[in-house]
Amino acid sequence: MTPLFSTPRAQRGKIRLAPILLWVLSVGLIAPDAAAGFYSDRPAAIEVIKSAELAGVDAVWAADLLSAAERQQSILDAIARPAEKTKPWHQYRQIFLTQRRIDEGVAFWDQHATVLDSVSLTTGVPPEVIVAIIGVETFYGRITGSYRVIDALATLAFDYPKRSTFFTGELEAFLLLAWEADKDPLALKGSYAGAMGYGQFMPSSYRAYATSYDGEGAPDIWDNPNDAISSVGNYLRAHGWRSGERVVVPATVTDPSPQLFEGGLKPSQSVAHWIALGMLPSEPVDEDAIAAPIDLEAQQGRAYWLGLQNFYVITRYNHSAMYAMAVWDLSQSIAAARRETAL
Protein backbone atom coordinates (compact mmCIF):
# COMPACT_ATOMS: atom_id res chain seq x y z
CA MET A 1 0.00 0.00 0.00
CA THR A 2 1.31 3.46 -0.89
CA PRO A 3 1.93 5.56 2.25
CA LEU A 4 -0.75 8.19 2.75
CA PHE A 5 1.48 11.24 2.64
CA SER A 6 3.53 10.18 -0.37
CA THR A 7 0.46 9.83 -2.57
CA PRO A 8 -0.27 12.53 -5.14
CA ARG A 9 -2.02 15.49 -3.54
CA ALA A 10 -5.21 14.96 -5.54
CA GLN A 11 -5.67 11.50 -3.99
CA ARG A 12 -4.80 12.34 -0.38
CA GLY A 13 -8.33 13.19 0.74
CA LYS A 14 -9.51 9.72 -0.32
CA ILE A 15 -7.41 7.87 2.25
CA ARG A 16 -8.11 7.77 5.97
CA LEU A 17 -5.45 6.93 8.55
CA ALA A 18 -7.14 8.15 11.74
CA PRO A 19 -9.66 5.25 11.99
CA ILE A 20 -6.76 2.79 11.88
CA LEU A 21 -5.08 4.63 14.73
CA LEU A 22 -8.29 4.68 16.74
CA TRP A 23 -8.64 0.93 16.28
CA VAL A 24 -5.04 0.36 17.36
CA LEU A 25 -5.64 2.46 20.46
CA SER A 26 -8.90 0.69 21.25
CA VAL A 27 -7.28 -2.74 21.32
CA GLY A 28 -4.38 -1.50 23.40
CA LEU A 29 -1.56 -2.04 20.92
CA ILE A 30 0.03 1.31 21.79
CA ALA A 31 1.26 2.10 25.27
CA PRO A 32 -0.61 4.90 27.09
CA ASP A 33 2.38 7.27 27.06
CA ALA A 34 2.77 6.91 23.31
CA ALA A 35 -0.97 7.19 22.71
CA ALA A 36 -0.95 10.52 24.50
CA GLY A 37 1.03 11.86 21.59
CA PHE A 38 -1.84 11.61 19.13
CA TYR A 39 -3.13 15.11 18.81
CA SER A 40 -5.90 15.19 16.20
CA ASP A 41 -8.78 15.09 18.71
CA ARG A 42 -7.55 17.93 20.89
CA PRO A 43 -9.60 21.14 20.64
CA ALA A 44 -6.50 23.14 19.71
CA ALA A 45 -5.65 20.63 16.98
CA ILE A 46 -9.17 20.81 15.60
CA GLU A 47 -8.74 24.58 15.28
CA VAL A 48 -5.48 24.04 13.40
CA ILE A 49 -7.25 21.66 11.03
CA LYS A 50 -10.03 24.20 10.46
CA SER A 51 -7.52 26.96 9.72
CA ALA A 52 -5.64 24.71 7.31
CA GLU A 53 -8.87 23.78 5.55
CA LEU A 54 -9.76 27.45 5.10
CA ALA A 55 -6.36 27.91 3.45
CA GLY A 56 -7.06 25.10 1.00
CA VAL A 57 -5.66 22.02 2.75
CA ASP A 58 -7.80 18.88 2.76
CA ALA A 59 -9.15 18.52 6.31
CA VAL A 60 -9.00 14.71 6.26
CA TRP A 61 -5.35 14.82 5.22
CA ALA A 62 -4.56 17.36 7.97
CA ALA A 63 -6.35 15.29 10.63
CA ASP A 64 -4.54 12.15 9.58
CA LEU A 65 -1.22 13.95 9.75
CA LEU A 66 -1.86 15.21 13.26
CA SER A 67 -2.94 11.70 14.24
CA ALA A 68 0.50 10.51 13.17
CA ALA A 69 2.32 13.16 15.23
CA GLU A 70 3.97 11.94 18.41
CA ARG A 71 4.72 13.85 21.58
CA GLN A 72 8.46 13.97 22.24
CA GLN A 73 9.59 14.74 25.78
CA SER A 74 13.15 15.28 24.55
CA ILE A 75 11.89 18.24 22.52
CA LEU A 76 10.37 19.84 25.60
CA ASP A 77 13.61 19.22 27.50
CA ALA A 78 15.74 20.73 24.73
CA ILE A 79 13.72 23.91 24.30
CA ALA A 80 13.94 24.55 28.04
CA ARG A 81 17.74 24.87 27.87
CA PRO A 82 18.89 26.59 24.63
CA ALA A 83 22.61 27.42 24.54
CA GLU A 84 21.88 31.15 24.16
CA LYS A 85 20.28 31.14 27.61
CA THR A 86 22.49 28.68 29.47
CA LYS A 87 26.01 29.72 28.41
CA PRO A 88 27.87 33.02 28.75
CA TRP A 89 29.13 34.63 25.54
CA HIS A 90 32.71 33.42 25.81
CA GLN A 91 31.56 29.79 26.06
CA TYR A 92 28.84 30.14 23.43
CA ARG A 93 31.37 31.64 21.00
CA GLN A 94 33.68 28.66 21.37
CA ILE A 95 30.99 26.35 20.03
CA PHE A 96 31.13 28.03 16.62
CA LEU A 97 34.55 29.65 16.32
CA THR A 98 36.50 26.43 15.80
CA GLN A 99 39.20 25.85 13.22
CA ARG A 100 37.21 23.03 11.69
CA ARG A 101 34.12 25.19 11.22
CA ILE A 102 36.23 27.96 9.72
CA ASP A 103 38.02 25.58 7.33
CA GLU A 104 34.79 23.93 6.23
CA GLY A 105 33.28 27.37 5.75
CA VAL A 106 36.08 28.20 3.32
CA ALA A 107 35.48 24.90 1.53
CA PHE A 108 31.72 25.51 1.33
CA TRP A 109 32.37 29.01 -0.06
CA ASP A 110 34.81 27.67 -2.65
CA GLN A 111 32.40 24.95 -3.72
CA HIS A 112 29.48 27.37 -4.13
CA ALA A 113 31.36 30.55 -5.05
CA THR A 114 29.41 31.24 -8.24
CA VAL A 115 26.04 30.97 -6.50
CA LEU A 116 27.22 32.99 -3.49
CA ASP A 117 28.52 35.77 -5.72
CA SER A 118 25.25 35.84 -7.65
CA VAL A 119 23.08 35.91 -4.53
CA SER A 120 25.30 38.55 -2.93
CA LEU A 121 24.94 40.72 -6.03
CA THR A 122 21.14 40.53 -5.98
CA THR A 123 20.62 40.80 -2.21
CA GLY A 124 23.56 42.93 -1.09
CA VAL A 125 24.47 40.39 1.59
CA PRO A 126 28.19 39.47 1.65
CA PRO A 127 28.94 35.82 0.84
CA GLU A 128 30.75 35.31 4.14
CA VAL A 129 27.63 36.25 6.12
CA ILE A 130 25.48 33.76 4.21
CA VAL A 131 28.14 31.07 4.66
CA ALA A 132 28.47 31.83 8.38
CA ILE A 133 24.72 31.56 9.00
CA ILE A 134 24.62 28.16 7.31
CA GLY A 135 27.75 27.23 9.27
CA VAL A 136 26.26 28.21 12.61
CA GLU A 137 22.87 26.69 11.85
CA THR A 138 23.83 23.29 10.44
CA PHE A 139 27.61 23.07 10.00
CA TYR A 140 27.10 23.68 6.26
CA GLY A 141 24.26 21.20 5.92
CA ARG A 142 25.93 18.44 7.92
CA ILE A 143 23.62 18.63 10.97
CA THR A 144 20.09 19.60 9.96
CA GLY A 145 18.17 17.90 12.76
CA SER A 146 16.85 14.42 13.49
CA TYR A 147 13.32 15.16 14.74
CA ARG A 148 10.31 14.74 12.50
CA VAL A 149 9.12 18.30 11.98
CA ILE A 150 5.51 17.33 12.58
CA ASP A 151 6.44 15.85 15.98
CA ALA A 152 8.43 18.94 16.99
CA LEU A 153 5.74 21.42 16.02
CA ALA A 154 2.82 19.41 17.42
CA THR A 155 4.64 18.81 20.70
CA LEU A 156 5.45 22.49 21.12
CA ALA A 157 2.09 23.75 19.86
CA PHE A 158 0.03 21.56 22.17
CA ASP A 159 2.31 20.74 25.11
CA TYR A 160 4.45 23.86 25.56
CA PRO A 161 2.02 26.54 26.79
CA LYS A 162 4.72 29.20 27.11
CA ARG A 163 4.97 29.50 23.31
CA SER A 164 1.93 27.64 22.10
CA THR A 165 0.66 30.56 20.01
CA PHE A 166 3.90 30.82 18.06
CA PHE A 167 4.25 27.10 17.43
CA THR A 168 0.58 26.68 16.56
CA GLY A 169 1.15 29.23 13.80
CA GLU A 170 4.23 27.32 12.66
CA LEU A 171 2.29 24.06 12.67
CA GLU A 172 -0.37 25.61 10.45
CA ALA A 173 2.36 26.93 8.15
CA PHE A 174 3.91 23.47 8.01
CA LEU A 175 0.62 21.89 6.93
CA LEU A 176 0.37 24.46 4.14
CA LEU A 177 4.01 23.98 3.16
CA ALA A 178 3.69 20.21 2.91
CA TRP A 179 0.41 20.44 1.01
CA GLU A 180 1.53 23.11 -1.46
CA ALA A 181 5.01 21.72 -2.08
CA ASP A 182 3.70 18.16 -2.35
CA LYS A 183 6.16 17.02 0.31
CA ASP A 184 5.79 13.95 2.51
CA PRO A 185 5.44 15.69 5.89
CA LEU A 186 6.39 12.57 7.83
CA ALA A 187 9.73 12.40 6.02
CA LEU A 188 10.78 15.99 6.74
CA LYS A 189 13.29 16.20 9.60
CA GLY A 190 14.52 19.24 11.48
CA SER A 191 15.56 20.69 14.81
CA TYR A 192 13.74 20.29 18.11
CA ALA A 193 11.99 23.59 17.31
CA GLY A 194 10.88 22.48 13.84
CA ALA A 195 13.51 24.41 11.86
CA MET A 196 14.42 22.84 8.53
CA GLY A 197 17.17 22.50 5.96
CA TYR A 198 20.62 24.03 5.52
CA GLY A 199 19.50 27.37 6.91
CA GLN A 200 17.04 26.04 9.49
CA PHE A 201 13.99 27.90 8.24
CA MET A 202 10.82 27.71 10.27
CA PRO A 203 7.78 26.81 8.13
CA SER A 204 6.44 30.38 8.09
CA SER A 205 9.85 31.69 7.03
CA TYR A 206 10.03 29.09 4.28
CA ARG A 207 6.69 30.18 2.89
CA ALA A 208 7.60 33.87 3.11
CA TYR A 209 11.29 33.98 2.16
CA ALA A 210 12.55 30.72 0.65
CA THR A 211 13.52 31.11 -2.99
CA SER A 212 14.53 28.74 -5.75
CA TYR A 213 17.92 29.80 -7.12
CA ASP A 214 17.12 28.76 -10.67
CA GLY A 215 13.47 29.81 -10.41
CA GLU A 216 12.18 26.31 -11.11
CA GLY A 217 9.80 24.58 -8.73
CA ALA A 218 9.39 24.94 -4.99
CA PRO A 219 12.55 25.95 -3.10
CA ASP A 220 14.42 22.89 -1.86
CA ILE A 221 16.22 24.06 1.27
CA TRP A 222 16.72 20.46 2.45
CA ASP A 223 18.89 19.01 -0.32
CA ASN A 224 19.77 21.86 -2.68
CA PRO A 225 22.51 24.16 -1.31
CA ASN A 226 21.87 26.67 -4.10
CA ASP A 227 18.28 27.15 -2.95
CA ALA A 228 19.46 27.32 0.66
CA ILE A 229 22.01 30.04 -0.15
CA SER A 230 19.45 31.99 -2.16
CA SER A 231 16.89 31.70 0.64
CA VAL A 232 19.25 32.90 3.40
CA GLY A 233 20.28 35.89 1.30
CA ASN A 234 16.68 36.73 0.50
CA TYR A 235 15.69 36.46 4.18
CA LEU A 236 18.34 38.98 5.23
CA ARG A 237 17.52 41.31 2.33
CA ALA A 238 13.82 41.22 3.18
CA HIS A 239 14.59 42.11 6.79
CA GLY A 240 16.47 45.25 5.83
CA TRP A 241 20.09 44.37 5.09
CA ARG A 242 21.97 47.45 3.89
CA SER A 243 24.55 46.66 1.25
CA GLY A 244 28.05 47.90 2.00
CA GLU A 245 27.26 49.09 5.52
CA ARG A 246 28.99 47.97 8.69
CA VAL A 247 27.52 45.41 11.07
CA VAL A 248 28.92 45.99 14.55
CA VAL A 249 31.63 48.13 16.18
CA PRO A 250 33.54 47.25 19.38
CA ALA A 251 33.29 49.83 22.13
CA THR A 252 34.41 50.75 25.61
CA VAL A 253 32.08 52.04 28.32
CA THR A 254 33.01 54.64 30.90
CA ASP A 255 29.99 53.91 33.10
CA PRO A 256 28.48 50.46 32.39
CA SER A 257 25.11 51.15 34.00
CA PRO A 258 22.58 48.33 33.42
CA GLN A 259 20.06 50.94 32.23
CA LEU A 260 22.31 51.59 29.24
CA PHE A 261 21.44 48.17 27.80
CA GLU A 262 17.72 47.97 28.49
CA GLY A 263 16.57 49.17 25.08
CA GLY A 264 16.80 45.85 23.26
CA LEU A 265 18.49 44.87 20.02
CA LYS A 266 16.82 47.31 17.63
CA PRO A 267 18.96 50.38 16.86
CA SER A 268 17.21 53.35 18.42
CA GLN A 269 19.68 56.21 18.82
CA SER A 270 22.62 57.66 16.93
CA VAL A 271 26.19 56.66 17.67
CA ALA A 272 26.69 60.27 18.82
CA HIS A 273 23.95 59.73 21.41
CA TRP A 274 25.70 56.67 22.80
CA ILE A 275 29.05 58.46 22.82
CA ALA A 276 27.49 61.20 24.94
CA LEU A 277 26.40 58.51 27.42
CA GLY A 278 29.93 57.18 27.67
CA MET A 279 29.89 54.35 25.10
CA LEU A 280 32.96 55.02 22.96
CA PRO A 281 33.53 53.22 19.63
CA SER A 282 36.94 51.58 19.36
CA GLU A 283 36.92 51.98 15.57
CA PRO A 284 35.89 54.84 13.28
CA VAL A 285 32.14 54.88 12.62
CA ASP A 286 29.61 57.38 11.29
CA GLU A 287 28.27 59.15 14.36
CA ASP A 288 24.94 59.72 12.62
CA ALA A 289 24.41 55.97 12.20
CA ILE A 290 21.67 54.49 14.36
CA ALA A 291 22.89 51.85 16.79
CA ALA A 292 22.01 49.76 19.83
CA PRO A 293 24.42 49.04 22.70
CA ILE A 294 25.42 45.39 23.11
CA ASP A 295 26.73 43.94 26.37
CA LEU A 296 27.98 40.34 26.62
CA GLU A 297 29.82 38.33 29.24
CA ALA A 298 33.46 37.82 28.23
CA GLN A 299 35.97 35.55 29.93
CA GLN A 300 37.43 38.57 31.69
CA GLY A 301 34.54 40.86 32.62
CA ARG A 302 32.14 42.36 30.08
CA ALA A 303 32.52 43.08 26.36
CA TYR A 304 30.69 45.91 24.58
CA TRP A 305 29.71 46.75 21.02
CA LEU A 306 27.49 49.11 19.09
CA GLY A 307 25.16 47.04 16.93
CA LEU A 308 24.15 48.74 13.67
CA GLN A 309 21.26 48.01 11.31
CA ASN A 310 22.87 44.94 9.74
CA PHE A 311 23.59 43.46 13.16
CA TYR A 312 19.91 43.86 13.98
CA VAL A 313 19.03 42.12 10.71
CA ILE A 314 21.07 39.07 11.74
CA THR A 315 19.14 38.98 15.02
CA ARG A 316 15.94 38.67 12.98
CA TYR A 317 17.23 35.24 12.00
CA ASN A 318 17.64 34.34 15.67
CA HIS A 319 16.63 36.90 18.28
CA SER A 320 19.87 36.73 20.23
CA ALA A 321 22.81 39.12 20.41
CA MET A 322 25.11 36.16 21.07
CA TYR A 323 23.86 34.43 17.93
CA ALA A 324 24.45 37.51 15.80
CA MET A 325 27.93 38.01 17.26
CA ALA A 326 28.79 34.35 16.59
CA VAL A 327 27.63 34.69 12.98
CA TRP A 328 29.59 37.90 12.53
CA ASP A 329 32.79 36.61 14.12
CA LEU A 330 32.60 33.38 12.12
CA SER A 331 31.98 35.30 8.89
CA GLN A 332 35.07 37.43 9.44
CA SER A 333 37.21 34.42 10.34
CA ILE A 334 36.07 32.55 7.22
CA ALA A 335 36.71 35.56 4.98
CA ALA A 336 40.19 36.06 6.47
CA ALA A 337 41.07 32.38 6.09
CA ARG A 338 39.89 32.36 2.48
CA ARG A 339 42.01 35.42 1.68
CA GLU A 340 45.04 33.68 3.16
CA THR A 341 44.50 30.57 1.04
CA ALA A 342 44.31 32.75 -2.07
CA LEU A 343 47.79 34.23 -1.48
Which residues does each predicted region cover?
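Cell-wall glycan-active module
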Residues: M1-F5, I15-L21, L25-S164, T168-K189, ...
